[in-house]
Amino acid sequence: PEVSVMSVGQSIEILKGMGLPVDVIARFGLEGMKGSHIIGHTRMATESAVTTEGSHPFSTGMDLCLAHNGSLSNHNRLREELKREGVKFNTLNDSEVAAGYLAWRLKEGDTLKEALESSLDVLDGFYTFVVGTKNGFAVIRDPIACKPAVMAETDDYVAFASEYHALDDLPGSANAK
């Protein structure tokens, strides 16, 4: 199995691997890690090859990462526009374009909220994004909410997923709000 470890910025470490989630957790020793938030993703590839590089989350900027459920129809055009702005891409994945767009907007001076709001007008398709920064994370859905997003909140955590089943094994999920 392929594994890729990247350190991005000062506060985010991106670990990518292919295989069952339980195997990837064991491979990286995630159970022993500490942090304020984690973004995980189980991918069903539709737009690009199944490779470690194509695995989520994606980052194209300091202390920013994105995981995506959905499909962007304008990612090829937007990728070319962002390349002209100096954004670098490592894959042909549409999710990396979304991460690149947000990183570019932040570099241009937008707040995360402004960048996310702008993405609703620029990114064409159906999607749910989870975006992680060094200070927290945000979830955003396309304007007509084609892709699901569910949330579980307890006194100890807040978790988002694209399906209820993904939250079943979290501690206290049966009593989550």
Role assignments for model-derived ranges:
Residues 1-177:
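Conserved short alpha-helical segments that host acidic/polar catalytic motifs at enzyme active sites
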